């Protein structure tokens, strides 16, 4: 007569713990899904018209030379852009040397990026909202570290969350490329006596 209560009491906690564990797992799963949705909850959805109005970067550079990359964008639409962004590919290359911990190697060292523009993405910068008709410039200080013919690809965006999309006037993506020749020898330079500015020969 004593055996039945013992079996009953030992089985009951097992069922209860299993139910609790399953419920906890389900709750965690639901909570995790909700957290992901909230990351870009404040970013509006839609297309925002953007024009790349100016790009400045020396097409010929010497190894070790420091140059300024300037990309200016304009909001050519009627609505404020939530967060104007710029993605630049080609600042690094992937090394094929075996056994290296990090295969990415710099083609240009970034001495300074756009002020207050750092994001969680290594090749994307953001400069905040941009009102209709306004312009904003992304400016980098870059030093060439690898010789050869190099290509930079740049693309404007309207937000980091993926809901706001930048489009050109023709409906395409506001983007472009720059082809730069980096020589092994530093560029010769002179000082313009009229302006006092340093001028690189060959530009």
Place the predicted regions along the sequence by residue.
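Bacterial N-terminal signal peptides that target proteins for export
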Residues: 2-20
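Serine/threonine-enriched low-complexity regions used as flexible
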Residues: 71, 143, 147-176
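A surface/secretory-pathway sequence property marking extracellular, secreted
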Residues: 85-124, 131, 138
